[in-house]
């Protein structure tokens, strides 16, 4: 065979193929489609066949000259060499012999040059190189255009520039062609594999044989050389040279580098392809190119450029020549300002650095051929103490022992010895291991596991290649220095010597090999105490020693309940066997000899040193041997950190090195080779991109800008209509959640390398309910999280509908008819209109409209869809981004189905995968331009600027401002002939207050109709019947009616529970029930209630309790109905619970004063429906036990569906009560809010519309709707957008009394009252869509004030009075009176506000229609209210008071406009310029609110005691005023003056807000039954942390209980773990999850409520208060030292103990326009007691709320900082005594950072924390560094 390289104008290719001595393998391929190394790696590792085989080059016995012997060169595999661009010059004329040589230089010739020839060629430096290194980076060859190139040679380069550019483009195509050929070899033997048991890993990288890639050409061109690379038939000479080289290496093996000892230069990974000439014509250049690219890991082949690290005054100094990305990461970790170093030591070659800081941390920085790593010692506390005393320190390394000596003090007498970390430690970090010297494998060959496959690193290309397809695990280096791994979990292999053990029957759980090759194997048997000792790996079975491990101490056996020891990991060292049991404790014994018996007594090994440093709850998770063969234990402490702890001479393991808090960067070229086609990419918008390839889910990492694997063994990936991604895996449909938080960060000082960053990794959530794994789903079509379809293995299409907000099916799963379908189904889809499509394997498409498959109509059948005309077969049917069907044919053509026909479709070009600035971020930035303010350094306070001009507010944001004329029309005066807006609003308010809302008329009518239905029900059912539950239990409707009977039972239970909840609400409102739902024995009916209600003409006067009791007694839902007992108690207790009349008089339609009107109507509806279900059960009884046929069941089904779907589910009373409404007034308030925003958005002259269009820069409603929709869809987690509109009016006045002259200054009292109303609409991102909230607040405020002032101008002018400064220069009759007035005022304000709001969730597919209806007015308010799911109504009140003071200095000039001496009124015009200052002296507030929905309610209470100095402000103004002053007299004596002025001004003000508020929020929600998903997740967690055999057996048996219900499985788990001793935080957390589910199931069984979220929140406008107490708190603490620590005090202590946390909070505190919230929660033990007490009915909301008043019961849950910006415009019209205001605003808020704390058994100190929001994103420097690393093929372990 020959490999020929042919350069042409169009393409060139080089193909090197792998050769396997045993069988044919896949060709090793070389090349790149771009300058990115990962692309090269993807091609090199595309196939898993023979990837580990290194090149086998057949070298001739003579050199190229034919005379001298050939020398084997240790040089890099060079693409330049393959292309011949280094040796040969430009083509000679065709007549020259050199160009017509028939054979040419072979690849063997190129790589076998002698040293002399190589040195001779060194005179000709490299040509200009195309590289991906850090020095010069180019995206494509076009980047070379225009750059000067220095060419060598004596003559001038004659090649035209255009021709060179064309050749450069050819080179790019050539590289792409090479990689394509290497990624998809055409060899027929590509699939061959080794048949040997151990994987054959090539003995050398010279074992790859060259094979041809194509035909050769005999023609030559002017700009291309033809090089023929031939293969010799006889390779015996090469084999001889190869064996000689191996022999030399065995005799003199290279030694690993040691600190302090001169180290020979070793081969090192170079993460880039060897530089190549940019054109094949440039091979003769002799002048060095000015381009000097720098690789991340420097060096050329054998050279290693070490890191340059020094110290300067204790600070880390990194040389600029270091890789920039690595410098960045080191500066962000070791180079922090808080880090101070005392000593530094470097190895001779600079590959290793040791740094000792003043906290006792010793850092080891190591550069190897494949990675960088930085780690530190495990326990710095002891060293820190010595350094603190001495003040100085030193570091030295013993060259013989390799021990690190740490000295403290100037003389360094006090030394601490520490074993330095070796290659074994770093291999544990990176997973990369090297073969030792003397093995069958090449020394230093790198090997690793990836996706359970062995991968070998190509030494020249630096690319990982798969060795074979066998599954391996537990790769490690053992005490003999060899590498071992498990094959298929049953065979132990020595990878270094290619030896294997026999295949065992049981799986191998753990193994160990000592220095002499003796092997210990622990098998994964049920008892876990059986193991084998083998003299060697390949020893005969007769020589094996089988052992049974037992406790040597009988007391240990009693403690464990058996004598056998359950081993989890095993190690042998120096003749002793050491094991760690399932509790992580150590035992040891001497290794027995053959014939000593099978029972081995194991003695406990107490680890006092580990207990002292890590606590008693540490666990031994495994063992390993270090570079010196010393045994180390892998110790996991309670902070989830793993430590390598060496075994000392005292038989104790001692703290060594922290393997968790480390910085690890390793080469991953070749491991990830994902390059999906555009149609395979799922665009998730701001969340990134996803792709599914070969069953593995990948995501485009926005941090590294590359594809990364996430989930394996996946069946399908699709995007639901709701915009979320869904995954079909293991027969289950799971919604993908895109990660938005960082990984856990340890709390404390051991988090040096915690670089907060979020990767947009998709994580599967809980499986959607309904689908069974046994169905083995093959395809899915998802509408949303509550509705989806699945194609089962049997070919059935099943639809599932889940009740929103629950994990329960709303309807039983429906199997669709297959009528009309021919062929075997392959896939299913739904389009944007929810039409269903089915694709068969034969390429046919069938469809059903939405109405047919959703209604389950029996007559509905499938219709075959006519496909577009095409000669090729249909390949696939997909959905576009807009969810429209796209048919793709095998010839590549595509057609889209739209408007009922197929149309040719051209896929849009794929945009950049990297997510740029989102639409929401763009809008936020624009809003930031319109606000002015700054954080006062060191204070945490933001000073804000506001300004207004002539009554127009929002003048400070001139960059984002609407036109003046538009603002006048929107806020002040609309010049039309229609009725003025204020008059219309007042008229509408009066009308709606009287007769309600026209859109709610169906509800009003239904309320009246239900009263009549209840009366009719009591007439029909006047005699008691058997309870409904018993009736249904006795029915037998046969096979056809089984499903109907189950539906009736489920509906009965739903009705009874709904009625019970309603009667509980009514009882609590009346006071006959307590807040916990129990009977209130102290209840006494109000004696005057009946009299008061008699005046209400809307009330019927009938006793609703008696009517309901009669109805329930006649048609009871169950034998022991709680509903019936409570109604009976209502009657006996004398509860007078009347209801409205059936016909409301005077056109009012409803009783607006009934606070529970809707709840009463819901109770009546439930009661009447129970009676009707009774009647249906009686009808079913007629055919029961008679095997009813299908027609009879069909009739019953129709009647049942009519009752449930039309008369109950579609009832407006049910709709609105499910939203949480209890009375009409709250519903009408929210209706008003919705209607207000429909009017606001559809009218372009409205203030809300104007402000929104201004911010979004849109014109007209259509563009507004489009931009608003796109912006809302781009909202990220923690972001929200709000719109508000407010208006108000008030009356205010002052009185200037005439005082005695003895009073030096005037005293001016004043008062005012203001009415205001505000409407709010907000959108916020939530899981699964957007939260939408409409709200209306209305309030009244009153204020009183006292002011004074004095004119100081007379003192300046020498006049006696102010009148003396008057001037008549303008007019003698109208004098101008100047004055300079100093004034001050004190005011008090009291404000009350009523709050109403409605919140619900919209999925992304519902948003466009919602926005269109809102902005165009095509939807009514009632229709908008019905949109979405999970509605929650909120109603509350707020009362605030404040005392403020102000001072001002005004220079004024006034002119008297009336005649002198005119009485009693004087008219004055005045202009002034002034300065003002204000301060809030005291403020307090009280707030209450209740949020109710279908599944629970939340109460919030806020009692904020008076706080002082909550805000200050300063301003300046220019004012023009006009007014009248009325002089009042009494009996001829002046009493005072009533002034009334109107003014216009230009003003600006600075203000800061220092207020703090607190609130308690408690949620009680309906408990849901535990599901199989809950059990599956729980058992997985328990099995991970409890590894004893009893638990393992129990969990395995639990999985086999197919028929067991989740509640039964939960009971088994509870019984098993109730007796378990919980030691360690992970076990504590697992058992805590079990207890939560137990309480939840108990609450569900008893139909009780469970405690949901419960928190105490403190909100700060002054961010410095997060960790610093205010004056009031300090005073309280001073007078009462026993007070518990406040949240600020606790956070301050956390920050002092954790520098990383301190840096994060300090960064958050520097954010302008932000506020902070600190949330506290109940400690676990107290919460568990509270949950049980609620379940037992012992406590209610009030009792739970009391627990939050004692902060000893609480722990810090989270700290959150949010930033908000707003654009507000409006107009204020102060006119004499009456003033009005009108404004609109658009605002956005985003989560700057949230710190969530996680606790273990210690409830006072958090174990770890996670970050969310902006602070969680990697800072730009780190992000850039990680991206650069990825480009070099390196990745940081996170």
Curated annotation (Swiss-Prot):
GO CC list: extracellular region; host cell
Entry annotated with the keyword Ribonucleoprotein: no
Residue ranges, compositional bias (Polar residues): 91-103, 407-418
Induction cue: Transcription of the dsp region is positively regulated by the alternative sigma factor HrpL.
Regulation of catalytic or functional activity: Polyamidoamine dendrimers inhibit channel and virulence activities.
Basic and acidic residues composition bias: residue spans: 1-12, 110-120
The keyword Nuclease belongs to this UniProt entry's keyword annotation: no
UniProt superkingdom: Bacteria
Keywords: Secreted, Virulence
Positions with biased composition (Low complexity): 27-46, 1480-1502
Record's subcellular location: Secreted; Host cell
Deleted gene: phenotype: Disruption mutant cannot cause fire blight. Mutant is severely impaired in its ability to induce electrolyte leakage in apple and tobacco leaves. Transposon insertion reduces the ability of strain Ea321, but not of strain Ea273, to elicit the hypersensitive response (HR) in tobacco. Mutant induces fewer necrotic symptoms on A.thaliana leaves than wild-type strain. It is unable to multiply in A.thaliana leaves and bacterial numbers decrease rapidly after inoculation.
Miscellaneous information on this protein: The P.syringae pv. tomato avrE locus in trans restores pathogenicity to dspE mutants, although restored strains are low in virulence.
Family: Belongs to the AvrE family.
Protein role: Major virulence factor that may function as a water- and solute-permeable channel dedicated to creating osmotic/water potential perturbation and a water- and nutrient-rich apoplast in which bacteria multiply within the infected plant tissues. Expression in Xenopus oocytes results in inward and outward currents, permeability to water and osmolarity-dependent oocyte swelling and bursting.
Domain notes: Secretion and translocation signals are located in the N-terminal region. The N-terminal region is required for interaction with the chaperone DspF. There are probably one or more DspF-binding motifs or domains near the C-terminus of DspE.
Binding partners and assembly: Interacts with the chaperone DspF (DspB/F).
Protein name: Type III effector DspE
Organism for this UniProt entry: Erwinia amylovora (Fire blight bacteria)
Gene that specifies this protein: dspE
